[in-house]
């Protein structure tokens, strides 16, 4: 679709069958046709090292360019030790460098956190938001999305098994679409 909004989806868990990946697929499935959500892998990004800025690895360059081309970013993250996974923090660092050339700058974004537990990865959600604000990414404030019991509300194919969670996420994605339009003008 020529008029679609290009959304880079960043799944913070590297496991192929992660609950975060399932949730990201489910979110994409309930988004309007105007949102084209592309899950961009982060597992192949070498750890950020400033010494590499003068001759960056090809995966860094490809990742940065993909983020730059996007209209918006959707982050879906679990919680590791009350924060975001290291792979996500590394992807954020890779995309933000070299200094003054951040691929993230000005990109509207939304954060969804999830866990099998009841708190829905609250700590990861807020640590991630703190980084995104610093990177000048307008983060959608409402609705907030903390999906607890995620293992019970999404199936292995990335579909919702709980109708109320599906409806909440449909509304979340609709709000995200409006947020993108608001920020991008």
Please report, for each region that a protein language model flagged, where it lies by residue.
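Cofactor-binding loop segments of dinucleotide-utilizing enzymes, especially the Rossmann-like FAD-
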Residues: 12, 42, 114-115
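Helix-loop-strand module that forms the ligand-binding subsite of alpha/beta enzymes
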Residues: 56-136
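N-terminal beta-loop-helix "entrance" segment that forms/cooperates
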Residues: 42-59, 154
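N-terminal beta1-alpha1 ligand-phosphate binding loop
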Residues: 2-34
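Glycine-rich phosphate/pyrophosphate-binding loop and the adjoining helix
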Residues: 2-4, 8, 138-185
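Short beta-strand elements in bilobed, periplasmic/extracellular small-molecule ligand-binding domains
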Residues: 34-47, 139-148
């Amino acid at each position: 679709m020529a008029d679609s909004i290009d959304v880079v989806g960043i799944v913070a868990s590297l496991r192929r069958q992660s609950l975060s990946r399932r949730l990201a697929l489910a979110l994409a499935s309930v988004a309007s046709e105007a949102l084209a959500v592309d899950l961009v892998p982060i597992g192949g990004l070498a750890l950020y090292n400033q010494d590499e800025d003068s001759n960056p690895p090809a995966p860094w360059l490809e990742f940065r360019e993909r983020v730059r081309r996007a209209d918006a970013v959707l982050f879906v993250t679990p919680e590791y030790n009350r924060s975001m996974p290291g792979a996500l923090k590394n992807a954020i660092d890779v995309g933000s460098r070299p200094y003054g050339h951040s691929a993230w700058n000005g990109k509207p974004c939304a954060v969804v956190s999830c866990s099998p537990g009841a708190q829905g990865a609250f700590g990861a959600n807020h640590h991630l938001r703190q980084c995104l604000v610093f990177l000048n990414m307008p983060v959608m404030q409402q609705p907030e999305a903390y999906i607890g019991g995620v293992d019970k509300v999404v199936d292995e194919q990335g579909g919702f098994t709980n109708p109320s969670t599906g409806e909440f996420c449909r509304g979340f994605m609709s709000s995200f679409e409006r947020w993108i339009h608001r920020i991008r003008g």
